Amino acid sequence: MIPVIVLNWNGLEDTLECMEVLLKQSYSNFHVFLVDNGSEKSDLNALQENFNNNDKVSIIANTQNLGFTKGNNRIIEMILRDYLDVEYIALLNNDTKVETEWLSNLVKSAKTNEADIVSSKMINYFDPKKMDNTGHEMLNTAEIIPFGQGEPIENFNTVFENIGSCAGATLYSTKMLRHIGIFDEYFDTGYEDAEIGLRATVLGYKCIFEPSAIVLHKISRSINKIRDYEYVLKIQLNIFYTYFKLMPLTVLLINLPSFLFKYSMVFLINIVFYRSFFLKMLSDAFYRTLFKERKKILESRRVFFDNHKAISSLQILRKQTFFLFFDIRRFIKFVVLRKPTDFER
């Protein structure tokens, strides 16, 4: 049996559309844990009315919004404890629409490729000729970013390794989760999937993209409900936390020149072009990382390296992407052409 976890938070219309196609999967041996994450009462009532009599669905009602991380963790913990024969757990955002072979192809790919994290082919719901993402890649300046975002879907038709997946449509092996742990609850909503993907990679687990596991994603539909300055700041804090928690010292030292150059240039650009929002956010993020979050980061780092053996620094360095080409494109798009970032929409 494959458990599929779907979280709903005041997104009834999206959730009903998601569930309609999810329940038509060709892979028959699955069960949906549909979690209402403290929505308004009308959402929960409607979900119960639609799915209480469906043997493939269990509805879990949280009295408050636990966020993405804790909302999923509570169910993952229960599955790992009570379903010892389960090999994989799938996570699916409620703002998605999957093809009927989605789950079957994820499971088949995991077994064929001996992978512990399998990323879906996530396509932009509103522009289905363009990709949302194929999983994650890591820049040598700390960021873990979506790979393939905005590119033509026909460019991504082969399996390849990545640095973990977007948790909006993914498959995790329970063997891996029992060893490396579940989502780090330092996170609330955002970047928790990047951290667990990097954690898995650093500990030698295989993460891949599966092009036949196709999902249409209403990009950022859920995040738009909570996006504000504090959310943007927390994402940047999450980037620093993840990097300094999981990277071996040798990797940190080798990447240091690129890291310092990149952020010096980012500060300079934000000053010259008077991008006050990002200037304030980055200043706050560096201050809080150095003076408020430092002890937490160092303790998380100590616990991680005391309890796990990482792959070699050389292997990690080979998995990184050099930052400059990506950031030049980002500079042209958001500064020169003045297109709004995801955080300004």
Regions found by a protein language model. Give the residues of each.
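A conserved acidic beta->alpha catalytic loop
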Residues: 12, 21, 36-46, 64, ...
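Short, acidic, metal-binding catalytic loop of nucleotide-sugar glycosyltransferases
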Residues: 20-29
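A short, conserved alpha-helix in the catalytic core of glycosyltransferases
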Residues: 163-216
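Non-catalytic, C-terminal membrane-associated alpha-helical segments of glycosyltransferases
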Residues: 252-345
